[in-house]
UniProtKB/Swiss-Prot annotation:
The gene is purC. It comes from Rickettsia prowazekii (strain Madrid E). Its EC number is 6.3.2.6. One of its GO terms (cellular component) is cytosol. Pfam families: SAICAR_synt. GO terms for molecular function: ATP binding; phosphoribosylaminoimidazolesuccinocarboxamide synthase activity. Belongs to the SAICAR synthetase family. This is Phosphoribosylaminoimidazole-succinocarboxamide synthase. InterPro entries: SAICAR_synt/ADE2_N, SAICAR_synt_PurC, SAICAR_synthetase. It is an enzyme of class 6 (ligase). Keywords: ATP-binding, Ligase, Nucleotide-binding, Purine biosynthesis. Pathway: Purine metabolism; IMP biosynthesis via de novo pathway; 5-amino-1-(5-phospho-D-ribosyl)imidazole-4-carboxamide from 5-amino-1-(5-phospho-D-ribosyl)imidazole-4-carboxylate: step 1/2. GO terms for biological process: 'de novo' IMP biosynthetic process; cobalamin biosynthetic process. Gene3D superfamilies: ATP-grasp fold, B domain, Phosphorylase Kinase, domain 1. It catalyses: 5-amino-1-(5-phospho-D-ribosyl)imidazole-4-carboxylate + L-aspartate + ATP = (2S)-2-[5-amino-1-(5-phospho-beta-D-ribosyl)imidazole-4-carboxamido]succinate + ADP + phosphate + 2 H(+).
Length: 236
């Protein structure tokens, strides 16, 4: 019987039969900015499909990630990764904090994508942290930071093109990375998920918000939005 190891806001981790492997289950839960938890029936199934599809695509272009295989409607078999205590957020359009903190017009397109690092801590409200702090805190070496930034740009470039092909703009994406050890050596590996839960996705023509942003404002329409994204990706 699998043992529950961790339960987050939208995913649950279980033990697997083999060492250094885990089972990751996608739930229907979503935590709003107010802290309220809501259930969007069927969201977990769609996120499992979307994330496994996108991780497979990234593997094909040489981005190593934790996905081994999708094992059922809600669960994936994944590689154990020692996850870094940071999130990597890459944005190509003014949204979220750029509007709130800098007073920018939502939708303003940056000349180049902007990469931010945030501490993975809900308790401290995910504070921004810079490269020198990350290095001095001993979380990543400067060389690891360089690799993470390069991979983030490559992932974003690839996913942006893929989403444009289905009429959706990838405005912002939140990624997580970690280390996988092989003896004394380690490699950087993409982990967590890539889904409408951690990507800002807008209709390319109307800028209508899709995915998690819709849950925040119009939760009754959220499932249809996730379904739209999954269906369009299925056609690729």
């Amino acid at each position: 019987m699998k043992k529950k190891l961790y339960e987050g806001s939208s995913k649950i981790l279980y033990s697997a039969e083999e060492d250094f492997l885990l089972i990751m289950a996608f739930s229907d839960k979503a935590v709003l900015e107010t802290g309220e938890t809501v259930d969007i029936s069927g969201k977990g199934v769609l996120n499992n499909n979307i994330s496994s599809f996108l991780m497979d695509k990234l593997e094909m272009i040489g981005i190593e990630n934790h996905l081994i295989e999708k094992i059922n409607m809600r669960e994936q078999l994944i590689q154990y990764v020692e996850v870094f205590p940071i999130q990597v957020i890459i944005s190509s359009v003014a949204c979220g904090r750029f509007v709130k903190e800098f007073g920018m017009d939502e939708g303003y397109v940056f000349d180049k994508p902007i990469i931010d690092f945030k501490v993975r801590s809900r308790e401290f409200n995910y504070p921004i942290v810079n490269e020198y702090q990350i290095s001095n805190f001993g979380w990543l070496t400067m060389d690891e930071i360089r690799i993470v930034k390069a991979q983030t740009l490559r992932i974003y470039d690839f996913l942006s093109g893929l989403f444009i092909g289905i009429g959706i703009r990838l405005v912002e994406c939140k990624l997580e990375f970690g280390r996988v050890f092989n003896g004394e050596e380690s490699i950087i590996m993409l982990t967590d998920e890539i889904s409408p839960d951690n990507c800002r996705l807008w209709h390319i023509n109307s800028n209508e918000k899709l995915g998690f942003e819709l849950i925040q404002n119009e939760p009754n329409k959220a499932f249809e939005s996730y379904q739209l994204i999954a269906n369009r990706l299925k056609e690729k």
